[in-house]
UniProtKB/Swiss-Prot annotation:
Alphabetized InterPro entries for the sequence: HemC, Porphobilin_deaminase_cofac_BS, Porphobilin_deaminase_N, Porphobilinogen_deaminase_C, Porphobilinogen_deaminase_C_sf
The organism of origin for this protein: Shewanella sp. (strain ANA-3)
BP term (GO), one: protoporphyrinogen IX biosynthetic process
Cofactor: dipyrromethane
Enzyme class: transferase
Highest taxon of the lineage: Bacteria
Note: The porphobilinogen subunits are added to the dipyrromethane group.
EC annotation from Swiss-Prot or TrEMBL: 2.5.1.61
Listed pathway(s): Porphyrin-containing compound metabolism; protoporphyrin-IX biosynthesis; coproporphyrinogen-III from 5-aminolevulinate: step 2/4
Protein name in UniProt: Porphobilinogen deaminase
Alphabetical UniProt keywords: Porphyrin biosynthesis, Transferase
Length: 310
């Protein structure tokens, strides 16, 4: 492999391609003369579009094919939305870099209404995220919530066709695809706690590939890493997957980190919440401690019930 060449495995969706192009541009910026190739490929998550994610295996659906490409030396790195990255990595692969975070909030998208509070009784809202569904049902039990799969363009088309009164998407995806004008309003973290890692881009590579790791190093954003590591540590301790509504959101002020988390029933009938503050350098410890607090407050019974049905 040429010392000055790097191959990026990426999904083919517009948002995944944006992320890969972003990393390509950053690599070209910090390493003038580098040759960066994109290798677009389909994953199971891109193919199975008629079934809710929670029912077909969850987050790993979007990364497995990319990981195989790296393990077989067909690609050097893979670029992911951090909220799609599973907790565990195959042997020989690891998360090397977390890039600076885009807006982590959820976005309310509607052609008719400006916010959730404006929605009339019984309005239809589209989202496949159990985390969003749970928090929405808790605040607005009158709403009819329907699953919504597909890439961002497909989801917007379904809204425009009148299948939904509103849909909820990650703000970061709309901003990156230059579709900010479609955002009727941003949903505060207090109203809808984001998913762990939402808005952040991660780069995975072979753990023994020192050449690639050295090329990637300048793309690391340490503050984003602290935040995402805390959020993921909480999720890991809870053994959270796509079948359970879990939200985690860390903010940093100076050297202090505040991490908020929640676990809910999918129907929104019960939500366990918690918050913890501590040194940002102890991100993992804070995430685990908050998870323990949530478990002791009743999250364990919610998780046990959900996994018993799975």
């Amino acid at each position: 492999m040429s010392e000055n060449r790097i191959r990026i495995a990426t999904r083919k969706s517009p948002l995944a391609m944006w992320q890969a192009e972003f990393v390509k541009a950053e690599l070209e910026r910090v390493h003038p003369g580098i040759v960066v190739e994109l290798l677009p490929m389909s994953t199971k998550g891109d193919v199975i579009l008629d079934t809710p994610l929670a029912k077909v295996g969850g987050k790993g659906l979007f990364v497995k094919e990319l990981e195989v490409a790296m393990l077989e030396d067909q690609a050097d790195i893979a670029v992911h939305s951090m909220k799609d990255v599973p907790v565990d990595f195959p042997e020989g692969l690891g998360l090397e870099v977390i890039c600076e975070r885009e807006d982590p909030r959820d976005a309310f998208v509607s052609n008719l209404y400006k916010s959730i509070s404006e929605l009339p009784l019984g309005a239809t809202v589209g989202t496949s995220s159990l985390r969003r569904q749970c928090q929405l049902r808790a605040s607005r039990p009158d709403l009819i919530i329907k699953d919504l799969r597909g890439n961002v363009g497909t989801r917007l088309a379904k809204l425009d066709n009148g299948e939904y009164d509103a849909i909820i998407l990650a703000a970061a995806g709309l901003i990156r695809l230059k579709l900010s004008e479609r955002i009727a309003s941003f949903i505060s973290a207090e109203e809808s706690l984001p998913a762990n890692g939402q808005g952040a881009v991660g780069i995975e590579c072979r753990t023994n590939d020192e050449r690639v790791k050295a090329l990637l190093a300048p793309l690391e954003h340490l503050e984003t890493r602290y935040r995402v590591i805390a959020e993921r540590a909480m999720n890991t301790r809870l053994e959270g997957g796509c079948q359970v509504p879990i939200g985690a959101f860390a903010e940093i002020h100076g050297d202090e980190m505040t991490l908020r988390g929640l676990v809910g029933n999918p129907d929104g009938s019960e939500i366990i919440e918690g918050v913890i503050t501590g040194p940002k350098t102890e991100a993992t410890k804070l995430g685990v401690a908050l998870a323990e607090e949530l478990l002791s407050k009743g999250a364990k019974s919610i998780l046990d019930a959900v996994y018993a049905k799975a």
